[in-house]
Regions:
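Single-stranded RNA-binding regions, centering on S1/OB-family and related RNA-binding modules
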Residues: 1-278
Length: 278
């Protein structure tokens, strides 16, 4: 049986004037229309094709070699292209827009905005469907991340404490406000780092490396910038946090630790309004 809403490697069983028919197992033969047949298939791979399976406008299984923006079981930020009496329709990169039923909204949506959704297969209709109700699709079991581990993040929503983000398509995490030093919005994809996995299972995130490796990296960055600026920079431990963030992308606290370590090592001199190479 073909996996609807996912990529499948399927065997070609029939050539016709309007496309290829692929073996969908219990689902029967699935059409790959001519417009989706690759022109450069190596001869040894002619009998098998990697295709995405979904339902066309007539609710028939169809194959495509086009790449959707998201597969079943994944999260993504998608643009609302239409809102009508049926529901909310999203652009997911395929000719037939993706339906988000009104029952799966968290709030009212309008055309042109972006929304973070999870994509699932409706068990009754076998239709690929989107939902903005994310909690039920995130893993609630204890996470096994380690502090400093690099992860993929999808920023999902703003909160009073910062931004909630989906970690590796599996878990909720939180980027606290004091860890944000650049423009942030829901739907943004970022590389991030595990800061802490708390005893209650909640995960704190950072947009910068953490731990000793991060400190070493920041120290090197400060020294390199000093060398590039004739050994002096108009910044110090008394500078405004905004200036520090714009120059190095870190918090004032982390910056003070870094220049303090460089000072102790005799590598720099700290003045009230600047730092200099020793």
């Amino acid at each position: 049986m073909a996996l609807i809403g996912r990529y499948n490697s399927l065997q070609v069983v029939k050539h016709t004037n309007f496309g290829l028919y692929l073996d969908g197992g219990a689902d029967g033969e699935i059409l790959l229309p001519n417009r989706y047949i690759p022109k450069d298939i190596p001869s040894e791979d002619e009998d098998w094709l990697n295709v995405f399976i979904y339902l066309d406008s007539d609710d028939k299984l169809i194959a495509t070699t086009e790449k959707p923006k998201v597969q079943v079981g994944e999260f993504a930020s998608l643009k609302v292209v239409e809102v009508n009496s049926i529901g909310v329709f999203l652009d997911w990169g395929l000719p037939k827009d993706l339906l988000l039923p009104y029952s799966e909204e968290k709030r009212q949506m309008t055309a042109g905005e972006y929304v973070v959704v999870h994509v699932y297969l409706d068990k009754h209709t076998r239709r690929i469907t989107a939902t903005a109700r994310l909690d039920r699709y995130l893993d609630k079991t204890p996470a096994s991340y380690t502090p400093g581990q690099e992860v993929d993040l999808l920023v999902a929503e703003a909160t009073d404490m910062g931004f909630k983000a989906i970690i590796n398509n599996k878990h909720w995490g939180l980027i606290h406000k004091n860890e944000i030093f650049k423009f942030m919005r829901a739907g943004k994809e970022e590389k991030g780092f595990i800061k802490e996995v708390r005893s209650d299972g909640k995960i704190s995130l950072s947009l910068q490396p953490v731990g000793e490796e991060a400190a070493t990296s920041l120290n090197s960055k400060i020294l390199a910038k000093l060398r590039d600026n004739n050994g002096t920079l108009p910044i110090s431990d008394k500078s405004d946090p905004t200036l520090i963030s714009s120059m190095f992308g870190v918090s004032k606290g982390n910056f003070k630790k870094a220049i303090g370590a460089l000072y102790k090592n005799g590598q720099i001199v700290i003045h009230a309004d600047r730092i200099e190479l020793s």
